[in-house]
Amino acid sequence: MKFIVKLFPEIMMKSKPVRMRFTKMLETNIRNVLRKVDEEARVQRQWDKIMVRVPEDKPEMIERYAERLACIPGIAHVLQVRESTFESVDDIYQQTLALYKEELAGKTFCVRVKRSGKHEFNSIEVERYVGGGLNQFTEAAGVRLKNPDMTVNLEIDNEHLYLVEKRIDGLGGFPMATQEDVLSLISGGFDSGVSSFQFIKRGSRTHYCFFNLGGDQHEIGVKQVAYHLWQKYGESHKVKFISVPFDPVVQEILEKIDNGQMGVILKRMMMRAASRIAEKMGIQALVTGEAMGQVSSQTLTNLNVIDRSTDMLILRPLIVMDKQDIINMSREIGTEDFAKSIPEYCGVISQKPTVKAVMGKILAEEEKFSEDLIDRVVEAAEVIDIRDIAVSMDTKITETETVDAVSGGEVVVDIRSPEEEEQSPLSLNGIEVKCIPFFKLATQFADLDKEKTYLLYCDRGVMSKLQALYLQEQGYHNVKVYRPA
């Protein structure tokens, strides 16, 4: 079984040297991602596509390959194909008939052929010959060139015939690391998750900067969002997660700053701190999830005042997006459930926020801050490799045990999202399994029998460890992490 990876059209429009560089990077990215699924993954770059071969003795890996390829930036679409050779146009027809005869029954169809190489026929001739044969010798409802029930796709590359079994839409965008790095200010909400994704999709290694205003519970939730985005869409490259303890800044704002100016000044302080962190990392741009007019600090006047707190470029990919569109996109990329479970901390500190900040007043208020305040919080920032999020959680989960087997009386809690649970249900003979999505666990765990012990399960063990830590901080000690052998 093979996959033919088609490049995003914008890549094909580049000059030859740039296209070559982008294609090489995409090949490397695909190899890096797939070899975490299967060390025997074979990836081969060609001029206008990339071939991925699934080992013949591992048919069970086909779906996993497809899932990962669909989430790698730079791919327009992926064709899951059956490869063979052919001797004539009639041979092409006979092979197509054998594969599609039953599937065409009762359906209208058309045949589409893409051809490269030297042949005695052209693509239209193959379409007519194969289409006519299928129409005559199958129980299809007939040929329909526009909006058919089914399209039979064939690709001919010199002597090779590729019968397309499935077309998988890709993520689009540019290959990871073909653009410069950015530092995304992430709060865990709808906006920051989507804005981070936009830059991952566009080919930038996206590092995460979190300003902790809500304690460990808030940080745990945000780490889940960042890890999800990286693991699903940016796993080909390592990135950093930076947690900045912003309590001292918030405390001084509450004690010293005029109520109406608090929101704008908080954002300015965040930009200053993030800029210094970015400079240390050699990053030239910040990314935020701000959208014009969404909240009081996001009027054009206030955004202008916020931008003038730093010389660094501030990018806002969501600036003219509607909130519902942002929520819809968060649903598509898998961050909606995280965002629903994370409270918004930034909006609670100012009761009467200004919508038209005056720079003179802002500067006067900022004179009240301690001189070394930003230096102190930046110095105290924790920088970790995002791959080590699970490890960092392990060091904190001192009272929570990880087990690979279930003992009598223990209950397994599947905390995966409903979609993941539906795709691969967890079934354990003779063992009670409860399905409680991670975003409902905090509220529903209190309703469970306190006399029982609960083993949290997810595919990779990261989410279960994060949730175990969260529950432990809430005072629940009848919880373990379940990692089956």
UniProtKB/Swiss-Prot annotation:
Keyword check for tRNA-binding: yes
CDD domains hit by this protein: PPase_ThiI, RHOD, THUMP_ThiI
Binding site for ATP: L185, I186, K267, G289, Q298
Pathway: Cofactor biosynthesis; thiamine diphosphate biosynthesis
GO biological process, one term: tRNA 4-thiouridine biosynthesis
Gene Ontology annotations for the cellular component aspect, listed alphabetically: cytosol
Residues of the THUMP domain: 63-167
Catalyzed reaction equations: [ThiI sulfur-carrier protein]-S-sulfanyl-L-cysteine + a uridine in tRNA + 2 reduced [2Fe-2S]-[ferredoxin] + ATP + H(+) = [ThiI sulfur-carrier protein]-L-cysteine + a 4-thiouridine in tRNA + 2 oxidized [2Fe-2S]-[ferredoxin] + AMP + diphosphate; [ThiS sulfur-carrier protein]-C-terminal Gly-Gly-AMP + S-sulfanyl-L-cysteinyl-[cysteine desulfurase] + AH2 = [ThiS sulfur-carrier protein]-C-terminal-Gly-aminoethanethioate + L-cysteinyl-[cysteine desulfurase] + A + AMP + 2 H(+)
PROSITE patterns: RHODANESE_3, THUMP
GO molecular function, one term: tRNA binding
Catalytic residues, chain numbering: C458
Protein name: tRNA sulfurtransferase
Organism for this UniProt entry: Shewanella loihica (strain ATCC BAA-1088 / PV-4)
Gene: thiI
